[in-house]
Amino acid sequence: MGVTVVSHPLVKHKLTIMRKKETSTASFRRLLKEISLLLCYEVTRNLELTTMSIETPLMPMEAPVLEGKKLVFASILRAGNGLLEGMLDLVPAARVAHIGLYRDHDTLQPIEYYFKAPEDIVNRLVIVVDPMLATANSAIAAIDKLKERGATNIRFLCLLAAPEGIERFTKAHPDVEVFTASIDECLDEKGYIVPGLGDAGDRMYGTK
């Protein structure tokens, strides 16, 4: 399906401020909400529409509305939750799934500790969210789990992606399109995206 880099000037500007090491936790969290709304606009751009009959104050008309079942936003915990607020502001009727994964700092492999998703996920568009696509191990594991539950229409949304992560992800899930605000240079020896923005979860919640 490929990779879409969202190159809107507001996205670029806000991402630059998020990258700055002196940006406060409060500002980082606010910017993450703002940029997630802009990214959500792009990832939902080609949703299918149908029409319904309505009446305006002046006359009846056939008007466009979204077709099919509501979206599912699937957050990879914990940092993925930072993207949810802005996305739910844009699509308040969306269902939400939570996938609890953390990365073993020695092996860089994901360890699952929680999974909760709507039961009728089979016929829904699922947008998986995580700020960083670094090694891609967590993203691959999350989508593996969603596919086990029957999801077939999946997209992945992140702030930053590493070329190594994109390569691994697209090999594992060639049917899942990736949307990102930036493709950075590479991964360092610890598996962090560089130049990156640090640990998104720590910066969002003020932890280390």
Curated annotation (Swiss-Prot):
Binds 1 Mg(2+) ion per subunit. The magnesium is bound as Mg-PRPP. Allosterically activated by GTP. InterPro entries: PRibTrfase_dom (IPR000836), PRTase-like (IPR029057), Upp_B (IPR034332), UPRTase/APRTase (IPR050054), Ura_phspho_trans (IPR005765). Catalyzes the conversion of uracil and 5-phospho-alpha-D-ribose 1-diphosphate (PRPP) to UMP and diphosphate. One of its GO terms (biological process) is uracil salvage. Gene3D superfamilies: 3.40.50.2020. Keywords: Allosteric enzyme, Glycosyltransferase, GTP-binding, Magnesium, Nucleotide-binding, Transferase. Its EC number is 2.4.2.9. Its cofactor is Mg(2+). Pfam families: UPRTase. It comes from the Bacteria. It catalyses: UMP + diphosphate = 5-phospho-alpha-D-ribose 1-diphosphate + uracil. The keyword GTP-binding applies. GO terms for molecular function: GTP binding; magnesium ion binding; uracil phosphoribosyltransferase activity. Disulfide bonds: none annotated. Coiled coil: none annotated. It is an enzyme of class 2 (transferase). The gene is upp. Belongs to the UPRTase family. Pathway: Pyrimidine metabolism; UMP biosynthesis via salvage pathway; UMP from uracil: step 1/1. This is Uracil phosphoribosyltransferase. 5-phospho-alpha-D-ribose 1-diphosphate binds at residues 78, 103, 130-138, 199. It comes from Brucella abortus (strain S19). Uracil binds at residues 193, 198-200. PANTHER family: ADENINE PHOSPHORIBOSYLTRANSFERASE (PTHR32315), URACIL PHOSPHORIBOSYLTRANSFERASE, CHLOROPLASTIC (PTHR32315:SF4).
